[in-house]
Amino acid sequence: MNKQVEIFTDGSCLGNPGPGGYGIVMRYKQVEKTLARGYRLTTNNRMEMLAAVMALQALKEPCRVILTTDSQYVRQGITQWIHNWKLRGWKTADKKPVKNADLWQALDKETARHQVEWRWVKGHAGHRENEMCDELARQAAENPTEDDIGYQPEPQ
């Protein structure tokens, strides 16, 4: 695991649920690459998570990764909550199914391939790469092309 890659991610949702998208900025040495995709019906949290999953999946080999997100949900979920969810068979402390378990499991699998340091940055605070990701995610949400097959509407 020699290569160190910086990854910045953001998710956006126009309405929650509604059309959504993710934006990713990846940097290796001085080279930056961006990724984005829009979904017809999803949530903001799913887009935040999917951004991290897709960014890590895009790495062709195990790397040392500094992943910066403006989502406390993603950062706390993957660094703190996930351990007990796995012990409980993907149930919360009150025995309910973990929301977005499909993406938590995918993120868990991807983080196992890499050495990931999770960082949080305040959104909409002028952080260059976060602002780039936000714009990519918003543009993707405005032009959705995919179905979020894992999205499950809340029971009414």
Swiss-Prot record:
InterPro entries: RNase_H, RNaseH-like_sf, RNaseH_domain, RNaseH_sf, RNaseHI. Residues 1-142 form the RNase H type-1 domain. It catalyses: Endonucleolytic cleavage to 5'-phosphomonoester. It is found in: Cytoplasm. Mg(2+) 2 binds at residues 10, 134. Residues 135-156 are annotated as: Disordered. Keywords: Cytoplasm, Endonuclease, Hydrolase, Magnesium, Metal-binding, Nuclease. Binds 1 Mg(2+) ion per subunit. May bind a second metal ion at a regulatory site, or after substrate binding. One of its GO terms (molecular function) is magnesium ion binding. It comes from the Bacteria. SUPFAM superfamilies: Ribonuclease H-like (SSF53098). GO terms for cellular component: cytoplasm. It is an enzyme of class 3 (hydrolase). Its EC number is 3.1.26.4. GO terms for biological process: DNA replication, removal of RNA primer. Its cofactor is Mg(2+). Pfam families: RNase_H. Mg(2+) 1 binds at residues 10, 48, 70. CDD domains: RNase_HI_prokaryote_like (cd09278). Monomer. HAMAP family: RNase_H. Belongs to the RNase H family. Endonuclease that specifically degrades the RNA of RNA-DNA hybrids. This is Ribonuclease HI.
